[in-house]
Amino acid sequence: MNEVTEQLLQAGVAGKLVIDLSTLLPADSEAIAARVTAGGADFVDCPVGGTVAPALKGQLLGMAGGTEAAVARARPVLDLLCRRVEHLGPAGAGSRMKLALNLPLALYWQALGEALSLLRGSGIVPETAISLMADSSAGPTVLRNRTQVVLDTLDGTDQPGTFDIAGLAKDLRLALALGQAEGLDLPVSRTTEQRYAAALSQGLGGFDGASLSRRAAG
């Protein structure tokens, strides 16, 4: 993003609106905002929740940071992409919320695999286990929406991910970096990050998070 920022500043941004949809550390978003606004532009950081399919339908979840005026100016654009845009505070607030939002998802795939490991040798088949989990409070939206992907993965065929292991690992590392910068202890996240690092070393970066579950299930 720094390279893109430099190119924008060199081209001149006075009077323009810059919207950053990427997921960054809040401090990085704040630094970009300072440079862009110093150049005379409005800046909004608005990382989004969702993948390609909801984006095409305008069904993303937008988490916006910036001044009231900048976010108001950005809304006509963001409303084309998002079913909901929440203004969370100054620049960097959107990035902070996005990291908080993605952290439980990254942890979930490891937790799902560990839960399934309890069923090894029991005769309970994955189809039944996943169906029950998806039909209970143990089943987040991602499990209900991606049941077949999870089952195919558990059956032995890793599936391409719309939000793949590499992306999950990147956001998990950013969350840990944010926690460290603020003196927070995130023990579950630290341990899970090691599992993601191992998965990346095995060449699984392009696959769905369920591939992490499969390895954890054994």
Please name every model-derived segment.
Residues 1-7:
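Glycine-rich, highly charged phosphate/nucleotide-binding loops
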Residues 7, 35, 80, 135, ...:
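Residues within well-ordered alpha-helical secondary structure of globular protein domains
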Residues 13, 55-56, 204-207:
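A generic fold-level signal
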Residues 2, 17, 23-102:
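Rossmann-fold dinucleotide-binding core
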Residues 8-14:
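Short, conserved loop/helix-junction motifs that constitute active-site signature segments
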Residues 13, 38, 80-82, 121, ...:
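Short, well-ordered coil/turn elements that cap or connect secondary structure elements
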Residues 94-216:
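Helical "substrate-binding/catalytic lid" subdomain
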Residues 15-16, 115:
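Short, proline-enriched alpha-helix->beta-strand connector loops that line the catalytic pocket
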